[in-house]
């Protein structure tokens, strides 16, 4: 559902994120590079007939090693959260990437399908394990969820971080266990 994803705006820059819930509250999970070093972010939920905007949302936690961020949502925000998956991801598994990469200068909703091409991609430069997948992602998709279907619902298996521009159909995702 479009209401479950969002676009975070920072000085005219957009990115994606997803609502998650913990024992400590409700947050937007995204990439650190989406919010940069800001202490607050404006979160917008682009719904079918309206856009909900929450300003001055506090950046609660930042992981520079994994390029992840949690932004607090106000109590007045009732957008549903998506559950984090505990399933072990395997090569060949079907996945869905979602986000708001934008089209014609405006954020636009995008859902793409693909499969896991390397469940344990290791990149020497940053000594991090990623999920490599074939679902198309574009600039602005950063911070959006990589999802698997579990029964009638979807669960988050990772946070889309970047695409390999030097190869076709290569998306790079931070696994949910890094959260």
PLM ranges: what are they?
Residues 2-28, 53-56, 111, 143, ...:
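A conserved glycine-rich beta-strand in the N-terminal activation segment of trypsin-fold
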Residues 7-9, 59-61, 134-138:
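Short Gly/Pro-enriched turn/cap motifs at secondary-structure boundaries
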Residues 18, 136-160:
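Catalytic nucleophile loop of clan PA
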Residues 19-21, 59-61, 99, 118-120, ...:
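A residue-level detector for short acidic-glycine micro-motifs
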Residues 20-66, 73-76:
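Catalytic-histidine neighborhood of serine endopeptidases
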Residues 30-36, 99-101, 157-166, 176:
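Short beta->alpha transition motifs characteristic of CBS
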Residues 79-131, 136-142, 162-171:
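Flexible, gly/ser-rich surface segments that form the specificity/activation loops bordering the active-site cleft
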